[in-house]
């Protein structure tokens, strides 16, 4: 039996991972906590085996004035929660990062991202995620495993990201140029199963999809 705490109580990924894990109640006890106003510090981290950290700012706002907030939430809060988890005996910390740590594609040229691709973020959203990853790696030890998830575009019922916008646009303007544009996606339930396997197998390291964007 694994006891899991999910940060980001109402997030798209958090809600769906919780539902997925609870389909096997003999394997998991799952609880959630909000990260607003340090509410997470009231949770008893000592009773959990795993923290799945989903809370963060997920979409890019290009305004430079937003950069400090991204670093505060995506980097500083992540590392603070991980330190708290380690201090209280949590054995595994799973961080919801993003393929954006490689770069935000701004051209029609296709780039293939593999496990050998080196991160090179070109905006503060990606950089805040990468800096969080680097901070988490410094905390890793034999008794505190760190798993970093770098998924591609996530879709599924209830998603408010880019794909629903594109689908809506297609219904209004069903004419697309002759571009051979490819982009990998992952259904939220497939992502949830990845999280499930990472927990059950007590894995650490970096996990991503092979991406053609």
Predicted regions and their residues:
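Short alpha-helix in the Rossmann-fold core of NAD(P)-dependent oxidoreductases
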Residues: 71-78, 94, 128-129, 184
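Catalytic helix-loop patch of NAD(P)-dependent Rossmann-fold dehydrogenases
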Residues: 72, 107-154, 175-178
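N-terminal Rossmann NAD(P)H-binding glycine-rich loop of SDR-like oxidoreductase domains
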Residues: 4-20
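Conserved Rossmann-fold NAD(P)-dependent oxidoreductase catalytic core, especially the SDR/UDP-sugar
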Residues: 79-124, 147
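Glycine-rich "substrate-gating" loop/helix at the edge of Rossmann-like oxidoreductase active sites
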Residues: 152-159, 178-189
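NAD(P)H-binding glycine-rich loop region in Rossmannoid oxidoreductase-like domains
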Residues: 40-76, 80, 84-87, 101-104
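Glycine/proline-rich active-site loop of Rossmann-fold NAD(P)-dependent oxidoreductases
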Residues: 130, 144, 155-165, 197-208
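A conserved pocket-lining segment of Rossmann-fold NAD(P)-dependent short-chain dehydrogenase/reductase
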Residues: 62-63, 168-186, 197-198, 202, ...
